[in-house]
Amino acid sequence: MKSIGNSSKMASHSPHSLLHTNRLPSFFVPVPAVFFPPPNIIQRNFAAPFTLRMKAIGATNATSSPSVDVNQLVDFLYEDLPHLFDDQGINRSAYDDKVEFRDPITKHDSIGGYLFNIFLLKIIFRPAFQLHWAKQTGPYEITTRWTMLMTFLLLPWKPQLVFTGTSVMGINPKTMKFRSHLDYWDSIKNNKYFSFEGLLDVIKQLRFYKTPDIETPRYSVLKRTANYEIRKYDPYIVVETTGDKLSGSSGFNDVAGYIFGKNSTMEKIAMTTPVFTEAIGDESGDVAIQIVLPAEKKMESLPAPDLEKNKLKSVMGAIVAVVKFSGKATEDVVRDKEGQLRKFLLADGLRPLDGCQLARYNDPGSTWPFVLRNEVLIKIDHFSLED
């Protein structure tokens, strides 16, 4: 779908703008580098420029501690990590030869194993990486926050896996190189290697949801927990009319008619997904049904609707919490999902606003219930990745 995240210093390679981690989750048993040396494609050597940089900030191979400017290493990460999965690759000379890497299901103790793992992920998962921030969190420690989107290319339906979290990177004070890299996922509690909870988190993301291959509103994934996802949506335009209930379809033919040519210029406009129904306030509040218009469309150039009850509306960008589910989106199911989501958000100290949206990505009349993709979205009053 989409995009990934938002930051004053940000790196983004995303399949959805999407959207869209410092280090990445891996789904392979660690392979000793002695048997599988890293391919040349990921052995790019930038030692000369990196050595000059290190000398500039006081790094040395001597046994005495150098004068450390960790802030410059933070700046280096902002420059280097965007290349995690491109042809340039990360600067391997920034890491000790013996570097400890660990995430909940992967473990390496050398730069060779670490780089080979990155290579495998690049080939099989086509990852999209976004660094939200990096900052010093200890005398010889930098913490980063990231989002990682991965498309598992070996399965026919190519599921998208989403991971968010932090990486704690330890610095060798003698060399000013990174000597450890420990990943912590937001979606699990047990982040120690080997975490069966982490493995299950991977497996459950492999399930099949039928998502049409058409345009969707652009968003960034800021955080994914065990119970919900936090997204930042870009602004978009909808054609909307009054609906009957959150799970209802009343009014759909009216808004669909607009994009099929029932407008002042008889223009046919491309269909998008999902179809939104929006409830304002509690169950007794008003309901609107909306079709999102393609991102290339501008409000000033759109044709007027033929039907007076159809309205064109600009929707401001927003940060929302989202829960995904399959099956038929009946009113009881949708309200139950909304209630559960509010409970999880409040338990995590977030402030959900009144009202919610139901996003339906498929035609329920022509799609098997167990592969339907439905989502409930609730706007968040305030959200910060610094919290």
Residue ranges of each PLM-predicted region?
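C-terminal and inter-domain tail/linker signature
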Residues: K2-F208
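A solvent-exposed interaction/effector surface
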Residues: Y193, E197, D201-D387
